[in-house]
Amino acid sequence: MNRRKETGELSRQQQKSLETKNKIFQAAKRILQKKGYEALSIKNICEEAKVSNGSFYHHFKTKDDLLSYYIEEQPSIDPDLLELPANAKEAEAAIVYVYLNYVHYCRELGVEFMANYYTPKNQSLNPLIRTERPYPIVTVHNYLQKCIDAGILSPRFPLEDITSDIRLIVIGNVFEWCLKNGDADFEGNMRRSLGKYLDAVLCKM
């Protein structure tokens, strides 16, 4: 369930669980911002959040699972609500929109958090070992599949290759933004690089 849904839809127990998750995450975020990923241990997180180890493991499997929770529970766009495009250009615009939404969420979390999240040591980013992929890729994959099934698009490459390429482009843009301490044109770079790639691979049937 998306953490941004109205709390009125949640039971008291679910709301309490959500509050505990947020408390744990805020503690992890403070540690990341002050000391970096190396200092982010479950012990330190629990001490900072003033919760037990058992409470942590009740909600998260690992510290990387904790970080992924807040990346994946961003404000979501239901792919079923994205209208089918009339052509490849409209499909491209919809995909770029999804990732501009992601850019906005990254800004909310801040450069310090994102810089420490996008590290090779965070194995939750490794698509080879993940059981679930981050939300934007899932949305885009499902959206493109609908376009292909409807006969609107005929991509030059397999869908899995395209979503993998998009993931790499997004990671590169996040890294550039973090490297420049937030001074890069995050939105502009994301729009331009994704747009050029999609121009090359999306074809109308």
Regions found by a protein language model. Give the residues of each.
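Short hydrophobic/aromatic patch on the recognition helix
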Residues: 49-60
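Short secondary-structure transition hinges
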Residues: 104-141
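Short, basic, alpha-helical segments at the C-terminal edge of helix-turn-helix-like DNA-binding modules
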Residues: 71-78
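Short amphipathic alpha-helical segment with a characteristic S/N-K-E followed by hydrophobic residues
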Residues: 24, 39, 62-67
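All-alpha amphipathic helical-bundle segments outside canonical DNA-binding/catalytic cores
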Residues: 128-133, 149-165, 188
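Basic, helix-initiating cap at the start of DNA-binding domains
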Residues: 1-35, 42-48
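C-terminal peripheral helix-coil segments that are non-catalytic and often amphipathic
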Residues: 1-7, 96-97, 101-104, 138, ...
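Hydrophobic alpha-helical connector segments
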Residues: 69, 82-108, 159, 163-166
